[in-house]
Amino acid sequence: MLTVENIEVTLGATPVLHGIDMVAQPGQVTAIVGHNGSGKTTLLRAMTQETPYTGTIRLDGADLASFKPWELATRRAVLPQASRIAFPFTVLEVVRLGLLAGRDGARKALPQEALARVGLSGFEGRYYQELSGGEQQRVQLARVLAQVWEPVQDGQPRWLFLDEPVSSLDIGHQLEVMEIAREYARGGGGVIAVMHDLNLTAMFADHVVLLADGRCLSAGRPAQVMTDVTLSQAYGCTLQVNTSPPGDATYLLPHLARRTGGAHHARRTG
């Protein structure tokens, strides 16, 4: 279990997170949602030890700050919003970087398995810089999967931290990536994903954390968090949530959204 207790972050002179508390469970996909500048990425970067913070973050009861970098690398893998590679690496070389960080390097075929999992079999010899943005994003996901391929190792759950994992993808590959996240969680691992697409969040998340202005506005199951009132408050526009008869799955109708004023413009990107 990953617990976040009273996390505060200041970037420069600007307070970004204000006393965030949240819990993420292994076996679940936890989605962090909110308007641009709400603090989603900052919170994720605090949880991955990339951003200084005050407060406490615990992984399976141990303070995350007490872990050595190599220990964290065997327990969790991070997919950032964007990854720039300056050198002309092939796709296979990029995915192999995940083996250097994790503990699954003994499986020589693992990079190929990871590429197959993201639908990129046969791309091993291509240069990363020659791929489309969506293909590069899937290569990076394959690298992350190779790092923590087994969702549970030595009896301990491992974690995927995904920052907008479907931002560059078409709808088919969006579904594929979210299914990978769900499958990883069902295998006993934990997944924490920053999401913008509320419909995908409703479809795939087990737990939703809704941020607004650097604070946790609501947390719980999608149906508990994603209500007309709460989402409209968070996003500063009128939103209508609907449920489809089969399975009562929550979904939104974006074409019914109406601006209610400049509630969230000119905010720091989250």
From Swiss-Prot:
PROSITE patterns: ABC_TRANSPORTER_1, ABC_TRANSPORTER_2, HMUV
Cysteines joined through disulfide linkages: none
UniProt KW keywords: ATP-binding, Cell inner membrane, Cell membrane, Membrane, Nucleotide-binding, Translocase, Transport
Gene Ontology CC entries for this record: plasma membrane
Binding site residues for ATP: 34-41
EC supergroup of this enzyme: translocase
SMART domains in alphabetical order: AAA
SUPFAM superfamilies documented for this protein: P-loop containing nucleoside triphosphate hydrolases (SSF52540)
Source organism, top-level taxon: Bacteria
Listed GO MF terms: ATP binding; ATP hydrolysis activity
Membrane topology (UniProt): Peripheral membrane protein
Signal peptide coordinates: none
The keyword Membrane appears for this protein: yes
Subcellular compartments: Cell inner membrane
Entry EC no(s): 7.6.2.-
Statement: the UniProt record of this protein carries the keyword Membrane: yes
Family as reported in the entry's similarity comment: Belongs to the ABC transporter superfamily. Heme (hemin) importer (TC 3.A.1.14.5) family.
Job description of the protein: Part of the ABC transporter complex HmuTUV involved in hemin import. Responsible for energy coupling to the transport system.
PANTHER family xref list: HEMIN IMPORT ATP-BINDING PROTEIN HMUV
Subunit record text: The complex is composed of two ATP-binding proteins (HmuV), two transmembrane proteins (HmuU) and a solute-binding protein (HmuT).
Protein name: Hemin import ATP-binding protein HmuV
Native organism: Jannaschia sp. (strain CCS1)
Taxonomy of the source species: Bacteria, Pseudomonadati, Pseudomonadota, Alphaproteobacteria, Rhodobacterales
Gene from which this protein is expressed: hmuV
